[in-house]
Structures are given as structure tokens and as C-alpha cells.
Swiss-Prot record:
Name of the protein in question: Phytohormone-binding protein CSBP
Gene that encodes the chain: CSBP
Hydrolase in keyword set: no
GO biological process: abscisic acid-activated signaling pathway; defense response
Complex formation: Monomer.
Protein species of origin: Vigna radiata var. radiata
Length: 155
């Protein structure tokens, strides 16, 4: 049975800039904001919308070595994107289903609320490092790094 874990964070960046790096430019941005984890991101199939398949290749010291994800939700008007792990990554660590959905909302001109929903399932006991509490910390760290990246004028 799929379970959900929800969290949120406020970032001091414009909604449009954050949406661009989360939805369109992440193939080039992810390795820049997570250089200690991600070697590169490859577009395998699709045009960036629903059905697009990506491979996140991790550095040699990171295990597992890759994660294949599919964009399962993409709504430009509501600024919502969902990425489901379909191979490797968390699925190699005991989870049978893992999806992260980001929904952006403008708080004010230079402040954006990011709602994060993690949907997950597992067939057996899972390692502590892949519990939604732990994986959500990684997701929030990624969002903070995106905030820093955008604040430094890198986008």
C-alpha cells in the first residue's frame, strides 16, 4: 500500500526562476548543485513533459550508481512536477515504489512555498537511510542548494 509523507519549505527566490530549474533546466542544474553526488543527468526519452525518462548517474563513491526516473506529472499552470523512480536508486535500497512531487506557490514576489509529497511503498523492511523522513531531508537540502544557486545569479 502506497504511503505518503508531506513536508514544505519556503525559499527566497522567485517562483518562475525556481520552476525553470525544477522543470526545464534540471538536466544541467542538478550536477551543479549536487556535485558531490550527481555526475550527470541524461535525457533518455521524451521532451521534458509527462513520460520523459531520465537517468541520474552518481559519482563512483555513491551507491547505487544511478537512478532512472520518469516524469509522471507536469503542470505548467499549477507549477507541479512529479518524478517517479523506476529503476535503481531508492528501488535498489528496499523500496518498491518512490515518487516525489513538487508543487510551487508564490508567497510574495521573491518568496516561494514548495510543497513536497513523497509517495512510497516497500515489500520488506527498509534501511533507515531510505525512510521518508531521511529522503525528505535530502530533498529539502536539494531545494536549499537550488535557492543558493539562484541567489548567486547562476541561472
Amino acid at each position: 500500500m502506497v504511503k505518503e509523507f508531506n513536508t514544505q519549505t519556503e525559499l527566497s527566490v522567485r517562483l518562475e526562476a525556481l520552476w525553470a530549474v525544477l522543470s526545464k533546466d534540471f538536466i544541467t542544474v542538478v550536477p551543479k548543485v549536487l556535485p558531490h553526488i550527481v555526475k550527470d543527468v541524461q535525457l533518455i526519452e521524451g521532451d521534458g513533459g509527462v513520460g520523459t525518462i531520465l537517468i541520474f548517474n552518481f559519482l563512483p563513491e555513491v551507491s547505487p550508481s544511478y537512478q532512472r526516473e520518469e516524469i509522471t506529472e507536469f503542470d505548467e499552470s499549477s507549477h507541479e512536477i512529479g518524478l517517479q523512480v523506476i529503476e535503481g536508486g531508492y528501488l535498489s535500497q528496499g523500496l518498491s515504489y518512490y515518487k516525489t512531487t513538487f508543487k510551487l506557490s508564490e508567497i510574495e514576489e521573491d518568496k516561494t512555498l514548495v510543497n513536497v509529497k513523497i509517495s512510497y511503498d516497500h515489500d520488506s523492511d527498509i534501511e533507515e537511510k531510505v525512510t521518508p523522513t531521511k529522503t525528505s531531508q535530502s530533498t529539502l537540502m536539494y531545494l536549499r542548494r537550488l535557492e543558493r544557486y539562484l541567489s548567486n545569479g547562476s541561472a
